[in-house]
Curated annotation (Swiss-Prot):
One of its GO terms (cellular component) is phagophore assembly site membrane. Pfam families: ATG17_like (PF04108). GO terms for molecular function: molecular adaptor activity; protein kinase activator activity. One of its GO terms (biological process) is autophagosome assembly. This is Autophagy-related protein 17. The keyword Membrane applies. The lineage of its organism: Eukaryota, Fungi, Dikarya, Ascomycota, Pezizomycotina. The gene is atg17. It is a peripheral membrane protein. Residues 1-20 have a biased composition (Polar residues). Autophagy-specific protein that functions in response to autophagy-inducing signals as a scaffold to recruit other ATG proteins to organize pre-autophagosomal structure (PAS) formation. Modulates the timing and magnitude of the autophagy response, such as the size of the sequestering vesicles. Plays particularly a role in pexophagy and nucleophagy. Residues 1-23, 469-492 are annotated as: Disordered.
């Protein structure tokens, strides 16, 4: 009785329908006890109808689960598709903001590099001023040695440097704020990616429900067929009892007094006292033997059929649990996807802040960069001033040397002139004396009162007025050569 084709009672209808001739009621105590036992066992087996009911419930539940799984898959897939597209948009925005950050970082480093170079040039020039001592010939006697840098105010340079340091500090603070915003954006994207990765929807082709449902429907159909075979077997047993003298009484007695450990069986509604008095249509000997043969054969398979019903039910329960687990998994996926969508909504609420942070960083950096460049121009202007200052000092040395040379030339010329004048004076005095000696006795004195005057005396001297200063100082030859060389390099 493993299948409907071999089920108990599969040939009973043919046997019953072929009974056309009256037959005496079957006698024999042994046969009666066997028939009663088969009937009660068959009646007990009919309680397996609960497995068929459960099978129908499972199939109905599986169909509902299939519909629910399709809906959940569609909803989750739709949400995840939307989330995936929005994540692509967010990544583009993130990359755009990162470009702003990277450009700012690169620009900041370039500006700092340029600033360091400008400051290094200024410091180098100041070091030259610091190491260039003013020649003592230019300063009052007894004064402590002083460098060229001592004659300029360094506070202006320090003020510019302090201003640049403050601008750099503000720029770093702005960068730090942008870093915080960017890291927060990265955390949001990381949460989305992590959640999205863990809630991927399985493609519909991977769903176990359709195959399980087909198996469940097959089991349900087989179980219905098995139950039908049990019912046919019971009808055959009942028919045999009807054709056995005292059969109903024996059945009622056996049902009322079951052996110890046996499952009670109710035969009310099946057995009726009046049946004993009904003259059943008699069976031929051949029909009786054929019926008993089929009954005995089917009775041996009743227990196997009942076991098969239970086994199929157990297998259906396992499949059903797997279906429910899959639906539960899909439900959880949908819940997780919904939670990710809520995270996405939160990210989009914060997104304007991230974009504004990038725009604010760019604007503030451009303003700071303009100020830094302005300060660098001031530094460069100060450096050029110091360079010109150093060059002017070299020019001063060369000018003093030139003046000294000019003075020396003037002195030489004056000395030569004085020598010539002195010679002229001496010659003039001699001529005057000779003239007076020759004609002095003859010329009246009052004729020309100046006749006896001495020759005029001439002299060269340095003019002294408000702008006059002492003679230009003498400078060492080495100092003049160094300044001349440096001035030539500056001019070249």
């Amino acid at each position: 009785m493993a299948s409907p084709t071999n089920a108990p009672g599969s040939q009973s209808q043919t046997s019953v329908s072929s009974a056309n001739h009256p037959d005496p009621i079957i006698h024999g105590r042994e046969i009666l006890e066997t028939l009663v036992s088969h009937l009660l066992a068959s009646k007990r087996s009919l309680s397996s109808i609960s497995t068929v009911w459960r099978a129908n419930e499972i199939v109905t539940s599986a169909k509902t689960a299939l519909e629910e799984s399709v809906i959940l898959n569609a909803r989750t897939g739709f949400l995840q598709s939307g989330i995936n597209e929005q994540m692509k948009v967010l990544m583009k925005v993130r990359n755009s903001i990162e470009c702003v950050y990277n450009d700012g970082q690169k620009d900041f480093k370039n500006v700092l590099h340029t600033l360091d170079a400008a400051n290094a040039r200024l410091e180098s020039t100041m070091d030259v001023l610091r190491s260039t001592m003013v020649d003592a010939a230019f300063r009052p006697a007894g004064e402590e040695p002083r460098s060229l840098l001592d004659f300029v105010d360094e506070q202006g340079v320090e003020g510019m440097r302090d201003g640049l340091k403050e601008l750099i500090r503000e720029s770093k603070e702005t960068q730090k704020e942008f870093d915080t915003s960017l890291l927060s954006f990265d955390d949001d994207l990381r949460s989305l990616r992590s959640g999205f990765k863990n809630t991927k929807v399985s493609p519909p082709s991977y769903s176990p429900i359709p195959s399980h449902l087909a198996t469940l429907e097959g089991h349900a159909q087989e179980m219905a067929a098995l139950l039908s075979s049990l019912s046919s077997h019971f009808d055959l047993c009942l028919n045999a009892i009807r054709h056995t003298e005292g059969g109903y009484a024996a059945v009622r007695n056996a049902a009322s007094n079951p052996p110890p450990g046996a499952e009670p069986v109710s035969v009310s509604g099946v057995m009726n006292t009046s049946h004993d008095d009904i003259n059943e249509e008699p069976l031929t000997e051949h029909e009786r033997e054929e019926m008993l043969f089929v009954l005995e054969k089917d009775a041996a398979e009743v227990e196997d059929v009942v076991m098969e019903l239970r086994d199929r039910q157990n297998e259906m329960e396992i499949k059903h649990d797997a279906i429910l687990d899959h639906v539960s998994h899909l439900t959880e996926q949908f819940k997780q996807t919904t939670s990710i969508y809520k995270i996405l909504e939160g990210v989009y609420e914060r997104l304007p802040g991230y974009i504004i942070a990038g725009q604010d960083f760019r604007a503030r950096w451009e303003d700071t960069k303009a100020q830094i460049c302005g300060q660098m121009d001031d530094l460069e202007g100060m450096r050029l001033f110091y360079e010109n200052y150093l060059s002017s000092y070299d020019g001063l040395i060369l000018e003093v040397r030139r003046r000294k040379v000019a003075e020396e030339k003037a002195k030489t010329i004056a000395k030569k002139a004085m020598e010539q004048i002195s010679k002229i004076y001496d010659a003039d005095m001699k001529e005057r004396h000779d003239f007076k000696h020759d004609v002095g006795d003859y010329l009246p004195v009052d004729l020309y009162p100046g006749i006896n005057a001495a020759a005029p005396r001439w002299e060269f001297r340095l003019m002294e007025d408000e702008e006059a200063v002492n003679s230009s100082p003498s400078l060492e030859r080495e100092l003049v050569e160094v300044s001349s060389k440096r001035d030539g390099e500056a001019q070249g």
